[in-house]
């Protein structure tokens, strides 16, 4: 049997399923091959951040995901004497969602899988293992071992989302440089949470590091450092497990333990994320220690970055060179997340008493410095995506006399556009992305965008699935809606967040990509020229009918 698809995804984990949902939205014919017979039923990740929740919103599944989360989950880092070294408790909503959330991964994965039922052109096939590939100028043909025999499926592109042991990466012969730490971790999940408090604790105990987290639906997780010489078999040794839990609960023997697993701490990044018609995403491209909670979220960032680009290429709207920007944009941020994860792992798993004593003293100093303490509490140490190259058009600060000299003005190109609550055209309070749509957006403050965008550029934007957005103070919403040109979305800034955001910058027009990254910023009068520059760097290939 032979078949033809636009995209083959290997691996039905969270990254593969998220990417499949994104491609499904774009109408891209996709097949997901998963060697296992069903979704993995044990949670690897336990933290989902605001960026990932925004992605769940993008694919229309956030309402299915939220019931399985603990929003605004505070982390307390303590030493061996239970003294608090630091608190991490970000409470802002820059992107519309809580910034730290506990979650049950298998239930979220299930929501992602069920979401694909919306798309008849997307297929998920379990018990199907890709055994070999053949590539030519027309695409990639995969030989697939299925429960009913061998099949051959051809696609324009293959995305390996098949985990840290990725067969796709191995097929490409790519190095997976980095390190595997000598210490491992033992995960113990318990039903009927015996503690019940909503926060998480990271214990930097030199005798044995640990973490404990409240998870949804009455589940409690513990993670303990295992030392060299302690084998994987200790996970099944009740006496050993109870000895670990004895300092944490009144009676370990009465716990309802539902899961125990040993895992290794890896920190590795693939040599390349793209080789011709093959791409890697998620753990196939990078792995990191679990302590920072960014492995799962980094994979979701990969899917969001890659999805719109793959769709544009296979649908003939952009050159295949657009796919080169995936690695250009994602690699440095991934490396920063790996470094953060390693540093946090070293912080809480170090069992050298001299170093941990120095750590405790340093934490006491930070606690006495308001700015440093606030930065830690607000999670200011977390690297945010910032693309200096790729599908972005940097701009210089304007020098026109009507604009004050603002050398310290925030620069936004390559960073995520915020998502406040706004009023949509019906006057309802909604998140910005729901009011504007999820594709390309040209957002202009207090100005009709059609006055500054030519018909040719507007048609090109529309064929890319983009929209023009007129943002106004909420008081002006009825008037702006009545005066809006056909196709222009009008949003009312009910909270003042958008007005304040534009006020901090000497630009009034913003071009936002489908992954919510700002591609360009400019003055309204410059918009048409800058928009066409964005089309150029995005390798847009079709010409509008009015050209």
Indicate residue ranges for each PLM-predicted region.
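Helical substrate-recognition/capping region of FAD-dependent monooxygenase/halogenase enzymes
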Residues: 2-6, 10, 25-26, 82, ...
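Glycine-rich FAD pyrophosphate-binding loop
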Residues: 24-44
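Core beta-strand elements of the Rossmann-like FAD/NAD(P) dinucleotide-binding domain
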Residues: 3-5, 148-157
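Conserved FAD-binding catalytic core of PHBH/FMO-like flavoproteins
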Residues: 113-114, 119, 128, 157, ...
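Active-site-adjacent segment of FAD-dependent monooxygenases/related oxidoreductases
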Residues: 41-44, 48-115, 215
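FAD/FMN-dependent oxidoreductases across multiple families
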Residues: 235-298, 318, 323, 340, ...
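N-terminal Rossmann-fold NAD(P) dinucleotide-binding loop
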Residues: 16-17
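A conserved short coil-to-beta-strand element within the FAD-binding core of flavoproteins
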Residues: 126-140
């Amino acid at each position: 049997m032979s078949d033809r698809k636009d995209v083959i995804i290997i691996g039905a984990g969270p990254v593969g399923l998220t990417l499949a949902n994104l491609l499904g939205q774009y109408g891209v014919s996709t097949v997901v091959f998963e060697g296992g017979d069903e979704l993995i039923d044990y949670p690897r990740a336990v933290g989902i951040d605001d960026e990932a929740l925004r992605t769940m919103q993008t694919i229309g599944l956030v309402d299915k995901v939220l019931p399985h989360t603990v929003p605004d989950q505070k982390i307390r880092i303590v030493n061996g004497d239970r003294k608090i070294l630091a608190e991490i408790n970000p409470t802002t909503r820059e992107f519309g969602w809580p910034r730290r959330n506990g979650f049950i991964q298998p239930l979220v994965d299930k929501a992602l899988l069920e979401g694909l039922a919306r798309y008849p052109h997307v297929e998920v096939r379990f018990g199907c293992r890709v055994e070999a590939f053949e590539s030519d100028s027309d695409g990639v043909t995969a030989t697939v071992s299925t429960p009913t025999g061998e099949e051959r499926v051809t696609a324009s592109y293959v995305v390996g989302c098949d985990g840290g042991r990725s067969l796709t990466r191995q097929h490409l012969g790519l190095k997976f440089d980095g390190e595997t730490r000598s210490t491992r971790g033992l995960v113990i999940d318990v039903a009927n949470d015996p503690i019940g408090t909503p926060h998480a604790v990271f214990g930097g105990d030199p005798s044995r590091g640990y973490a404990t987290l409240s998870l949804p639906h009455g589940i409690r997780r513990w993670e303990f450092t295992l030392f060299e010489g302690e084998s994987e078999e200790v996970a099944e040794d009740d006496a050993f497990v109870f000895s670990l839990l004895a300092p944490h609960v009144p009676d370990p023997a009465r716990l309802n333990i539902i899961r125990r697993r040993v895992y290794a701490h890896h920190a590795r990044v693939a040599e390349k994320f793209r080789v011709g018609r093959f791409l890697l995403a998620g753990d196939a491209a990078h792995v990191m220690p679990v302590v920072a909670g960014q492995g799962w979220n980094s994979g979701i960032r990969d899917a969001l970055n890659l999805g719109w680009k793959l769709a544009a290429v296979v649908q003939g709207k952009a050159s295949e060179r657009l796919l080169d920007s995936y690695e250009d944009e994602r690699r440095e941020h991934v490396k920063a997340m790996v470094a953060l994860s390693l540093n946090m792992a070293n912080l809480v798993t170090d069992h050298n008493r001299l170093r941990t004593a120095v750590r405790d003293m340093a934490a006491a100093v930070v606690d006495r410095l308001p700015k440093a303490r606030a930065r830690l509490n607000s999670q200011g140490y977390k690297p945010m995506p910032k693309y200096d190259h790729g599908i972005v058009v940097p701009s210089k600060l304007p020098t026109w006399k009507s604009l004050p000299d603002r050398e310290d003005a925030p620069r936004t190109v390559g960073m995520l556009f915020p998502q406040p609550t706004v009023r949509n055209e019906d006057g309802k309070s909604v998140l910005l992305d729901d009011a504007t749509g999820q594709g390309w957006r040209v957002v202009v403050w207090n100005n009709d965008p059609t006055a500054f965008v030519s018909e040719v550029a507007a048609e090109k934007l529309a064929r890319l699935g983009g929209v023009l957005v007129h943002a106004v103070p909420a008081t002006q919403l009825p008037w702006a809606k009545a005066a809006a040109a056909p196709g222009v979305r009008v949003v009312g800034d009910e909270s003042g967040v958008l007005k304040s955001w534009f006020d901090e910058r000497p630009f009034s027009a913003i071009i936002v990509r489908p992954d919510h990254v700002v591609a360009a910023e400019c003055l309204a009068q410059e918009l048409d020229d800058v928009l066409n520059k964005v089309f150029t760097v995005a390798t847009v290939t079709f010409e509008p009918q009015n050209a």
